[in-house]
């Protein structure tokens, strides 16, 4: 018999999360959990994959999966086309939420905060270490815009390859990084009977407070 959606579930029994295990600020815990994910998660799961949610000018939410490409005590960095749908949404409403899910570890992290562009120098530094095809794609693809078909896209790629046939492509002005400056970070550890552990960090006047949330 085919399993129905209502019957699809798994119990979480791997680990717990206590206040005693958790530092006073969230970045150290995120680093620990991220390192655990890198060591534990196997393809097709990518440890740095996260869902990014933004809101358009009408208040409608949009989400998509991206890759985290930078992390420091300021925040979480990702790169994209500034003229894409998410780029336009962030220009109008510079706030976003990220969610990381690591199924093997039965862990999830939710991050919310304000978003700002990184410097042109930081964007260029990352752009230059990307594979050549990805660098050309940043020039060729009019991201999020309607195109006729795949042939149109491949034609744009060929034009871009010809344009940079004798030189290395540089970072286009319409492409670069954003940094999410976290105001809230929640760590979720799956537990048995859906009685999950949830530790929530909030930034208040530049200082982090920690609290437990009911599952």
Curated annotation (Swiss-Prot):
- Hey, which pathway is this one from? Cofactor metabolism; pyridoxal 5'-phosphate salvage; pyridoxal 5'-phosphate from pyridoxamine 5'-phosphate: step 1/1; Cofactor metabolism; pyridoxal 5'-phosphate salvage; pyridoxal 5'-phosphate from pyridoxine 5'-phosphate: step 1/1
InterPro entries cross-referenced by the UniProt entry = Pyridox_Oxase, Pyridox_Oxase_CS, Pyridox_Oxase_N, Pyridoxamine_oxidase_dimer_C, Split_barrel_FMN-bd
Catalysed conversion reaction:
pyridoxamine 5'-phosphate + O2 + H2O = pyridoxal 5'-phosphate + H2O2 + NH4(+); pyridoxine 5'-phosphate + O2 = pyridoxal 5'-phosphate + H2O2
Give the residues the record marks as binding substrate. 9-12, 69, 126, 130, 134, 194-196
Q: Identify the EC number(s).
A: 1.4.3.5
Which enzyme class, named as a word?
oxidoreductase
MF annotations from Gene Ontology:
FMN binding; pyridoxamine phosphate oxidase activity
The record's remark on the cofactor is: Binds 1 FMN per subunit.
Ligand binding (FMN): 64-69, 79-80, 86, 108, 143-144, 188, 198
Q: Which cofactor does it need?
A: FMN
Q: Which GO terms describe its biological process?
A: pyridoxine biosynthetic process
Keywords, sorted A to Z = Flavoprotein, FMN, Oxidoreductase, Pyridoxine biosynthesis
**PROSITE patterns membership:** PYRIDOX_OXIDASE
What superkingdom heads the lineage?
Bacteria
Assembly information from the UniProt record: Homodimer.
Q: Name the protein family.
A: Belongs to the pyridoxamine 5'-phosphate oxidase family.
- Main role? Catalyzes the oxidation of either pyridoxine 5'-phosphate (PNP) or pyridoxamine 5'-phosphate (PMP) into pyridoxal 5'-phosphate (PLP).
Q: What is this protein called?
A: Pyridoxine/pyridoxamine 5'-phosphate oxidase
Name the encoding gene, please: pdxH
């Amino acid at each position: 018999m085919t399993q129905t959606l209502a019957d699809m579930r798994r119990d979480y029994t791997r680990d717990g999360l206590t206040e005693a295990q958790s530092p006073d600020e969230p970045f150290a815990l995120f680093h620990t959990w991220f390192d655990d994910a890198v060591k534990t998660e196997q393809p097709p799961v990518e440890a740095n994959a996260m869902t990014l949610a933004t809101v358009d000018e009408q208040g409608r939410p949009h989400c998509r999966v991206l890759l985290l490409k930078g992390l420091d005590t300021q925040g979480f960095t990702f790169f994209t086309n500034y003229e894409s749908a998410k780029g336009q949404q962030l220009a109008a409403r510079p706030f976003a939420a990220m969610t990381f899910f690591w199924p093997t570890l039965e862990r999830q992290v939710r991050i919310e905060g304000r978003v700002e562009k990184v410097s042109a120098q930081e964007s260029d530094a990352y752009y230059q270490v990307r594979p050549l095809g990805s660098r050309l794609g940043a020039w060729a693809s009019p991201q999020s815009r309607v195109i006729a078909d795949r042939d149109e896209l491949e034609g744009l790629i060929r034009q871009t390859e010809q344009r940079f046939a004798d030189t290395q492509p540089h970072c286009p002005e319409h492409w670069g990084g954003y940094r999410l400056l976290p105001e809230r970070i929640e760590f979720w550890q799956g537990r048995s009977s859906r009685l999950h552990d949830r530790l929530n960090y909030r930034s208040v006047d530049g200082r982090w407070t920690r609290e437990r949330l009911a599952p």
